[in-house]
Amino acid sequence: TGEQYFCGYPFFVNENVLTPRADTEILVEEALKKLKTGDSILDMCTGSGCILLSLLLMKEGCRGTGVDLSEKALQVAEKNRRKLLSEKTDCVFLQSNLFDALPEEKFSLVVSNPPYIKTADIEELMPEVKDHEPRMALDGEADGLFFYRKIAGEAKRYLTKGGYILFEIGFDQ
C-alpha cells in the first residue's frame, strides 16, 4: 500500500492491485514504438492503470480504455487517472470480464500484462508476491496461458487494420 514509481510517474497502489515492476516498463517502451498521435489503446487487465496511463502521458493525443474484472482495482486506476492525467485526456476504465462488457470499438493497440503464473506454481512464489499481491492478478490457470489465448482470440474483432497486440509474458513461456 502506498506509492510506486513506474516509468517515472508516481502511482498509488494498495492490496487490490499488482505492484508495478520495472520489468513491465519494457512493455511500455515497446508499445511507444508502435503508437502514433491519435491512436487508441486498450489495456486488458489494467489493475492500477500504470501501463495505460504511462502510455497516455508519454504519447500525447492518444486515447485509452482500461479494462479489469476487479471493481477495487478499477477504483485504484481511476484514482491514478485523476492524479496523473489532464481532464482533456480521453481515458476511461470499465469493469468487464475481458471483452464481455466492452462496446464494439476499434483500437490501434491492445496491451496487457495478464495473470500468467501457473496455478500450481503460485505457492512457490516469493512470500512478498504470493502473500501480498491479489491472487486474481497472478493466476493464469493450469498452464499460465489462459488469458493470452482469450485475449489474442478475441482481440482481432477490436483491432484496427494494422493494429498490434503486445503482452508481458513470463520468462518460461
Enumerate the language-model features and the residues they cover.
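Conserved SAM/SAH cofactor-binding pocket of Class I
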Residues: 25-124
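Mobile active-site "lid"/loop adjacent to the S-adenosyl-L-methionine
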Residues: 116-146
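Conserved Class I SAM-dependent methyltransferase catalytic core
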Residues: 142-173
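Helix-to-beta-strand junctions that scaffold the AdoMet/dcAdoMet cofactor pocket
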Residues: 36, 133, 159-161
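Short glycine/threonine-rich catalytic loop with a Thr-x-Gly-x-Asp
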Residues: 20, 47, 144
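Class I S-adenosylmethionine-dependent transferase superfamily signal
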Residues: 31, 55, 129, 151, ...
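Conserved SAM-binding loop
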Residues: 43, 66, 140, 166-167
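Conserved AdoMet
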Residues: 1-33
